[in-house]
Amino acid sequence: MQIRRAQPEDRCRMAEIFVYSNRLNYFPIFGDEAYSFSKLQVTAVLADFSEWIGDLENAYVWDDGILRGFVVSAGGEVFKLYVDAFFQGRGLGGALLEFAIAQTGARRLWVLEKNRCAQAFYARHGFLPTGEWRYEEGTSERLLLLSWEEPGDGQ
């Protein structure tokens, strides 16, 4: 596996992946051009990295010479999981998620109700809806809470 703790020099690449992935996946849901193409900029993310992405101490990157994705997980929750779109479909997201489960104790995460691709991805890795939901702040879009159980638990 090529997963390691994120370092300060990773911030720019992480911000780039975050911005592109947000535009690709969330603009079709929210349709907010001003946010997606004016406010959401790599420079803005870098300027307030911990607000947009989180603390580096809770971030891990897939790096095989190219930083291809990252996960931010703490307190039993996955807060961010992004893989550069050019490298998706290679098992990197699954490896990062499994790392978060095994190494950080991740057992829950929130996903947009309309993000069906993400829901399917998480379901393949054992994260299922709990029935709990909330609105994404400042929007009418719902976030669903997904929870993971150790295979064999509850059976």
PLM features: what roles do these ranges have?
Residues 2-16, 25:
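A short beta-loop-alpha structural element at the N-terminal edge
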Residues 110-112, 128-145:
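Conserved catalytic-core motifs of GNAT/GCN5-like acyltransferases
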Residues 56-69:
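Conserved beta-hairpin
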Residues 74-86, 111:
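Conserved acetyl-CoA binding element of GNAT-fold acetyltransferases
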